[in-house]
């Protein structure tokens, strides 16, 4: 008796089990969020429906910049290989969107074929028409870098209204479509000719809902002197501050991202450190891909909820018979007041609402009589997903991340940053002398010995109190000096002999020169007399 009640209750109590985060996101979207989107025509206003390929695809990196800022050369530098369809030159060369992806053989897949392939995440680009699809292709090639990530090369952004109109498709809208689905957006600027055209400003503004994905690269920085570089960097930050309206400062990487010799090598160390940081950021993408997809689904769910409230409010205000057209105009003009009313009634953050101007434009062409009234059950299902299902998936995300290596992307330029004499920081700081036969501290030991014998050694060793008097002269914080003491006291007897004291001073010098201290003492820094204990 009442078996239908018990089944329903049991279904609510038992959480759904997923094998992977991607499978969980796919099922949650199809079962809980998609019905809300379809009921309130979300896809006509904001973004096409997600497909299976959107949840399974590799992390993607989108490169955006004005012409001749080095976008295609940047890809060539990363993968260390020419790719089909690649054109490089000082004039506007890349006139297409090129998805550089892994494939068993080299080749090009045209846009019209790409958008009918269910294994690719590009099917919804069909909506931008033939003018765009004729300017879209996939360059396939076997490459170890592309095993882990895909890279989207874009046409160089030009100045002037003529070029914008002659494209034949909405360039900013296409970029916005990609921005929703990629894991990283890299904006490239040329340090030698810094200029932000009107179209580029519009493009950056179109990406404003994805600031967390944006990184900026100031490329070709080896072509200018240090003083000029500082001025260019300041001008870039000032320009970006006017376009990207966020309190946080966007991360800018400075360098020269190609394999040619540096024209002005003054800032070589800076460029190496910046390249290393950017590579680490890109290498982290596969590890963080599941979290990014989860975050994007949450953002989409919040927008879908707000959209449902907007559409149902408009439906509620519409008359049943007469004066529909005049009422529609009135509602569109007063959409800002409807936003405020929804914000108050449902305690929704202003940041969750879509652009007022864009929404007004889209509503002009809609038939309000086809809008649906509020259906609380659909909203409750999405609320339940956000409150419970997403929390369970977060646990799975952390588990999947812990099983992945920290740097998944390998091959190409990424191999050049690995261990070896040309690895970043090799032979510097605590690594100095790593390949020397002699103990690297030995060359300065006579100087340290003079200080050591003024500190009243007993049986060839000084106490911690006496060592502290000398070590604090470095003005380093006690936390740092405490770490240096632990590293230098190799035999852990609470005292320092002459070699250990020399080692402590060497580590102080390393820190004062701006290098990090090692977590454990490297073998080449162990004093010669202690090496037999190792």
Curated annotation (Swiss-Prot):
What does UniProt say about this protein's domains?
The EH domain interacts with Asn-Pro-Phe (NPF) motifs of target proteins.
Q: Where is this region: G1 motif?
A: 65-72
Q: What is its main location?
A: membrane
Where, subcellularly, is it found?
Recycling endosome membrane; Early endosome membrane; Cell membrane; Cell projection, Cilium membrane
Domain EH, chain residue ranges per copy: 444-532
Effect of altering residue 65 to R? Abolishes ATP-binding and localizes to cytoplasm
What protein name is recorded for this chain?
A: EH domain-containing protein 1
As for what it does, the entry says: ATP- and membrane-binding protein that controls membrane reorganization/tubulation upon ATP hydrolysis. In vitro causes vesiculation of endocytic membranes. Acts in early endocytic membrane fusion and membrane trafficking of recycling endosomes. Recruited to endosomal membranes upon nerve growth factor stimulation, indirectly regulates neurite outgrowth. Plays a role in myoblast fusion. Involved in the unidirectional retrograde dendritic transport of endocytosed BACE1 and in efficient sorting of BACE1 to axons implicating a function in neuronal APP processing.
The cross-references to CDD domains, in alphabetical order and at most eight, read:
EH, EHD
- Region described as G3 motif: 153-156
- Kindly give the SUPFAM superfamilies that the UniProt entry links to this protein: EF-hand, P-loop containing nucleoside triphosphate hydrolases
Say which domain of life the source belongs to. Eukaryota
Q: Which membrane topology term applies here? A: Peripheral membrane protein
- State the Gene Ontology terms under molecular function: ATP binding; cadherin binding; calcium ion binding; GTP binding; identical protein binding; small GTPase binding
Q: What is the effect of changing residue 485 to A?
A: Loss of accumulation at the ciliary pocket. Loss of function in ciliogenesis. Abolishes interaction with RAB11FIP2. No effect on MICALL1 localization
The UniProt record gives the binding positions of ATP as 65-72, 220, 258
What keywords is this UniProt entry annotated with?
A: Acetylation, ATP-binding, Calcium, Cell membrane, Cell projection, Cilium, Cilium biogenesis/degradation, Coiled coil, Endosome, Membrane, Metal-binding, Nucleotide-binding, Phosphoprotein, Protein transport, Transport
The entry assigns this protein to a family as follows:
Belongs to the TRAFAC class dynamin-like GTPase superfamily. Dynamin/Fzo/YdjA family. EHD subfamily.
GO cellular component labels: ciliary pocket membrane; cilium; cytoplasm; early endosome; early endosome membrane; endocytic vesicle; endosome membrane; extracellular exosome
Q: Which residues carry this modification: N-acetylmethionine?
A: 1
- Annotated spans, G5 motif: 243
What is its quaternary makeup? Homooligomer, and heterooligomer with EHD2, EHD3 and EHD4, ATP-binding is required for heterooligomerization. Interacts (via EH domain) with MICALL1 (via NPF1 motif); the interaction is direct and recruits EHD1 to membranes. Interacts with RAB35; the interaction is indirect through MICALL1 and recruits EHD1 to membranes. Interacts (via EH domain) with PACSIN2 (via NPF motifs); regulates localization to tubular recycling endosome membranes. Interacts with PACSIN1. Interacts with RAB8A. Interacts with FER1L5 (via second C2 domain). Interacts with MYOF. Interacts with ZFYVE20.
Residues bearing Phosphoserine? 355, 456
Region G2 motif: start-end pairs = 91-92
